[in-house]
Swiss-Prot record:
Keyword Transferase: yes
Keyword Chaperone assigned: no
Family membership: Belongs to the class I-like SAM-binding methyltransferase superfamily. rRNA adenine N(6)-methyltransferase family. RsmA subfamily.
Subcellular location: Cytoplasm
Binding site for S-adenosyl-L-methionine: H13, L15, G40, E61, D85, N105
Reaction catalyzed: adenosine(1518)/adenosine(1519) in 16S rRNA + 4 S-adenosyl-L-methionine = N(6)-dimethyladenosine(1518)/N(6)-dimethyladenosine(1519) in 16S rRNA + 4 S-adenosyl-L-homocysteine + 4 H(+)
SMART domains hit by this protein: rADc
Function: Specifically dimethylates two adjacent adenosines (A1518 and A1519) in the loop of a conserved hairpin near the 3'-end of 16S rRNA in the 30S particle. May play a critical role in biogenesis of 30S subunits.
Biological source species: Bacteroides thetaiotaomicron (strain ATCC 29148 / DSM 2079 / JCM 5827 / CCUG 10774 / NCTC 10582 / VPI-5482 / E50)
Gene: rsmA
Name by which UniProt lists this protein: Ribosomal RNA small subunit methyltransferase A
Keywords annotated in UniProt: Cytoplasm, Methyltransferase, RNA-binding, rRNA processing, S-adenosyl-L-methionine, Transferase
Length: 267
């Protein structure tokens, strides 16, 4: 079989360490009864361990050369190799709307977008595991007060328990990336509803972290406007990285109340 050359524009760094691949494959075992979707399998170094598990496995790959390689290397997967862009797919059609585990050695250039896609489909993705850039993994797992705590941390931790599992050297890839990688696992928590307007919650989180050096009283103004009244809650004197998920929910409710008050008074 003709080997696939990694394509820079697709952010491809092919994993070549079988022990690391096995360890990543084993992270899906938290939900042994669910099917698995692997994103960006490349030449199947992770796939080979996933297919050995007694469960349905599908892979989605945007690179036509990798798809051709996979079809030849894994004939038993023929009907489950999907040539498509994961970010544009309707995930509810994959397993007839049933839940599945998401995994992969994710391309660095779209890892954040993949996790936003996961959040959009959290009703059918109870678990997401895989390898990403170490810096992004640390950001997702970070808690309040950390310099790496940010938009991804809050939005993901609102719905998922995050585990930073292990760090991976850059030398186990072809070509080696310039940074280290890490494997994480995100498992849905018990939250059914946030207790606030979800769309406004996202807006509040993104707006405040985009001006993270400002106090919330100032960074929230793009949403509220200059003349919108705020309560004297001490929460507004904090910076976004100081707030827990629960405090962001409280903040969102206060912002919504302030918007209603402003609308009612004609501001």
């Amino acid at each position: 079989m003709k080997l696939v050359k990694p394509k820079k524009f697709l952010g491809q760094h092919f994993l070549k360490d079988l022990k690391v691949a096995q360890d990543i494959a084993d992270t899906v075992d938290t939900f042994p009864e669910l099917p698995v979707l692997e994103v960006g399998p490349g030449m199947g170094v992770l796939t080979q361990f996933l297919v050995k598990k007694d469960r349905l496995v599908k892979v989605v790959e945007v690179d036509y050369e990798s798809v051709a390689y996979l079809r030849e290397a894994y004939p038993s997967l023929e009907d489950h190799i999907i040539e498509d862009d994961f970010l544009k797919m309707n995930l509810h059609r994959l397993f007839d709307g049933k839940p599945f585990v998401l995994t992969g050695n994710y391309p660095y250039n779209i890892s954040s977008q993949i996790f936003f896609k996961m959040l959009e489909n959290k009703d059918i993705i109870p678990c997401c595991t895989g390898m990403i850039q170490k810096e992004v993994a640390e950001r997702i797992a970070a808690g309040p007060g950390s310099k790496t705590y940010g938009i991804l941390s809050v939005l993901i931790q609102a719905w998922y328990k995050v585990e930073y599992l292990f760090t991976v050297s850059e030398h186990v890839f072809n070509p080696p990336p310039k940074v280290k990688s890490a494997v994480i696992r995100m498992t849905r928590n018990d939250t059914k509803e946030l207790g606030c307007d979800e769309k406004l919650f996202k807006q509040v989180v993104k707006t405040t972290f985009n001006q993270r050096r400002k106090t919330l009283r100032n960074s929230i103004k793009p949403i509220l406007g200059k003349d919108c009244p705020l309560t004297e809650d001490a929460l507004f004197n904090k910076r976004p990285e100081q707030l827990s998920v629960e405090e962001f929910i409280s903040l969102t409710n206060q912002v919504e109340e302030a918007l209603k008050t402003a609308t009612a008074s004609g501001n």
